[in-house]
Amino acid sequence: MVQGPNTHRNLDDSPAGPLLILSPCAGTPTRSPAAPDAPDFRLPCHFGRPTRKRGPTTPPLSSPGKLCATGPRRVYSVTVCCGNCGKELTFAVKTSSTSLLGFEHLLNSDLDLLCPRCESRERHGKR
């Protein structure tokens, strides 16, 4: 339901998908041939807040240049809304672009990530 002053616009009441921003972190070295950059995914947050892309994050140290069956692995910064309160959660993942697309599909269809506060409430049965 949309609340606010009377307007002459017809607003869509259906919620949009979750916020999902997947982008490669800057300065990630790889030992394999250069792969084309994965696209920067921007989907609207279902809580109606505008999306804001943050700067590159410093990825955690790990074994460099690993290759997996689906191609070279790179570090990506992921920003998604909490499934309960809508707070932005940002974390880094290291994967191939093919696996990243599968992760995007999972986040858009069946998986809700929770912030620490909402996770604690769910664990203790509070809503």
Curated annotation (Swiss-Prot):
Top-level taxon: Viruses
GO cellular component labels: host cell cytoplasm; host cell nucleus
Biological process terms in GO annotation: DNA-templated transcription; symbiont-mediated perturbation of host cell cycle G1/S transition checkpoint; symbiont-mediated suppression of host innate immune response; symbiont-mediated suppression of host type I interferon-mediated signaling pathway; symbiont-mediated transformation of host cell
GO molecular function, one term: DNA-binding transcription factor activity
Region Disordered, annotated ranges: 23-66
Motif placement: Nuclear export signal: 100-108
Pfam family, one: E7
Keyword presence, DNA-binding: yes
Region span, E7 terminal domain: 2-56
unnamed zinc finger segments: 82-118
Compartment(s): Host cytoplasm; Host nucleus
Keywords: Activator, DNA-binding, Early protein, G1/S host cell cycle checkpoint dysregulation by virus, Host cytoplasm, Host nucleus, Host-virus interaction, Inhibition of host innate immune response by virus, Inhibition of host interferon signaling pathway by virus, Interferon antiviral system evasion, Metal-binding, Modulation of host cell cycle by virus, Oncogene, Transcription, Transcription regulation, Viral immunoevasion, Zinc, Zinc-finger
Keyword Metal-binding assigned: yes
Post-translational modification: Highly phosphorylated.
Assembly notes: Homodimer. Homooligomer. Interacts with host RB1; this interaction induces dissociation of RB1-E2F1 complex thereby disrupting RB1 activity. Interacts with host EP300; this interaction represses EP300 transcriptional activity. Interacts with protein E2; this interaction inhibits E7 oncogenic activity. Interacts with host TMEM173/STING; this interaction impairs the ability of TMEM173/STING to sense cytosolic DNA and promote the production of type I interferon (IFN-alpha and IFN-beta).
Domain characteristics, as noted in the entry: The E7 terminal domain is an intrinsically disordered domain, whose flexibility and conformational transitions confer target adaptability to the oncoprotein. It allows adaptation to a variety of protein targets and exposes the PEST degradation sequence that regulates its turnover in the cell.
Job description of the protein: Plays a role in viral genome replication by driving entry of quiescent cells into the cell cycle. Stimulation of progression from G1 to S phase allows the virus to efficiently use the cellular DNA replicating machinery to achieve viral genome replication. E7 protein has both transforming and trans-activating activities. Induces the disassembly of the E2F1 transcription factor from RB1, with subsequent transcriptional activation of E2F1-regulated S-phase genes. Interferes with host histone deacetylation mediated by HDAC1 and HDAC2, leading to transcription activation.
Family: Belongs to the papillomaviridae E7 protein family.
Protein name, per record: Protein E7
Protein's organism: Bovine papillomavirus type 1
